[in-house]
Amino acid sequence: MPMILGYWNVRGLTHPIRLLLEYTDSSYEEKRYAMGDAPDYDRSQWLNEKFKLGLDFPNLPYLIDGSRKITQSNAIMRYLARKHHLCGETEEERIRADIVENQVMDNRMQLIMLCYNPDFEKQKPEFLKTIPEKMKLYSEFLGKRPWFAGDKVTYVDFLAYDILDQYHIFEPKCLDAFPNLKDFLARFEGLKKISAYMKSSRYLSTPIFSKLAQWSNK
């Protein structure tokens, strides 16, 4: 029985989950909920089901795998990673994975707060000034390793890929000074399952955010 992944019909928090499901050749189906247009931004597709799915903390995204019903994007990522032994093999690798997981969420929320802010255009110039330091930290942490935890792919590479790609879309020159990050993106996109998925009709690169956002909302 295929797993069910539920989320809005956008990239959002679910991009790394979709990529991980594809990489692991998992059997899954998507339930993509549509949001209405302005001014009401109707969310009834989701709200009509929200409390009928048996979720402990009803929210999007959710993953239903048989009797297991999981919400919170990183909880879903960790669940899938444990199933497929992608959490890191040594304590050092698991520590690195934990750090990257939380760093990615910090940087994700910073971009979200900007892009959903009514003063987006006014605040964007100052935000752009902070990006080089963010990218520098990722570059130094990755170093000469092929993957963020070490020599093998782990679930945090899917998270890192997503956030670096989002920032790269937001500011196309932000990785120019960090060749190891550009190489990482290319290496990730070159993974056989990932490459095939990105060429498929199921792949959703944009919009990154919902219709309520000021950027990448359609």
UniProtKB/Swiss-Prot annotation:
Residues the record lists as Phosphoserine modifications: 67, 205, 210
Principal cellular location given in the protein's record: cytoplasm
Domain of life: Eukaryota
Binding annotation for glutathione: 7-8, 43-46, 50, 59-60, 72-73
GO CC annotations, alphabetized: cytoplasm; cytosol; extracellular region; mitochondrion; protein-containing complex
Gene: Gstm1
Residue ranges annotated for the GST C-terminal domain, each copy included: 90-208
Official protein name in the record: Glutathione S-transferase Mu 1
Residues holding substrate: 116
Gene3D superfamilies named among the record's database cross-references: 1.20.1050.10, Glutaredoxin
Pfam family, one: GST_N
Organism: Rattus norvegicus
Subunit structure and binding partners: Homodimer or heterodimer.
Keyword Coiled coil annotated: no
